[in-house]
């Protein structure tokens, strides 16, 4: 399963130029099996995205990107996080915009993964994220962080099984292997080094 785990839709992320239908169209064209909408500090799109997902038969998982005291974190199953069943990722931890956790990755407990490939982050900063991810034994995540059409699906996450519901997605993230993947122009390469 290939899923872009970090996308912004313009209704609740005002810095995005993407509408939900456009995101889904591009994702399908690139062969993605699902997408995640992770708007800034909002899950307001959830009901609309769930209804659209049912209507078109395509998984759309709504999470949230929130700014913590030390940096941005994305989360899915946020209502499950309180029960310790949600999934939390440090997104773009070494991006030079002061919104990443940076070395605080070591201090934040209960993180499940690290965005080791973020489409809006320079490669060297992504490599630093990969080193920390491995040091901490967390899940490696790839995500576009798209705000514009050409970024959708640039980097994604590979899972060995396909899931279609948010609870199953969260369970899969916890229990299955994850690997980042890179769009090549005609398909995806699942990578361990970059």
Language-model features: where?
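Acidic/Gly/His-enriched mid-domain segments of enzyme catalytic cores or analogous surface patches
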Residues: 87-97
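Divalent metal-dependent hydrolysis catalytic cores, especially in the metallo-beta-lactamase
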Residues: 4, 24-42, 87-89
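Active-site flanking residues adjacent to catalytic metal/cofactor-binding acidic residues
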Residues: 5, 38, 64, 91, ...
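Alpha-helix-loop-beta-strand connector modules within alpha/beta enzyme cores
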Residues: 53-61
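Charged catalytic cores and adjacent phosphate/nucleic-acid-binding surfaces used
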Residues: 1-5, 9, 13, 19-26, ...
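Short helix-capping and hinge/turn segments at secondary-structure transitions, especially at repeat
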Residues: 86-87, 116
């Amino acid at each position: 399963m290939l899923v872009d785990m970090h996308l912004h839709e313009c209704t609740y992320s005002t810095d995005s130029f993407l509408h939900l239908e456009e995101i889904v169209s591009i994702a399908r064209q690139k062969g993605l099996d699902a997408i995640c909408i992770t708007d800034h500090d909002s899950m307001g799109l959830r009901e609309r995205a769930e209804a659209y997902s049912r209507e078109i038969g395509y998984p759309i998982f709504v999470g949230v990107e929130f700014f913590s005291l030390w940096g941005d974190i994305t989360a899915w199953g946020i209502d499950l996080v309180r029960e310790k069943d949600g999934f939390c990722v440090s997104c773009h931890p070494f991006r030079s915009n002061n919104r990443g956790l940076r070395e605080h990755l070591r201090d934040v407990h209960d993180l499940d993964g690290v965005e080791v490939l973020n489409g809006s982050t320079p490669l060297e900063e992504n490599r630093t994220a990969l080193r920390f991810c491995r040091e901490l034994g967390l899940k490696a995540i790839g995500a576009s962080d798209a705000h514009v059409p050409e970024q959708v699906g640039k980097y994604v996450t590979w899972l060995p099984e396909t899931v279609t519901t948010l609870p199953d997605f969260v369970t899969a993230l916890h229990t299955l292997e994850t690997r980042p993947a890179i769009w090549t122009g005609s398909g995806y390469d699942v990578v361990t080094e970059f």
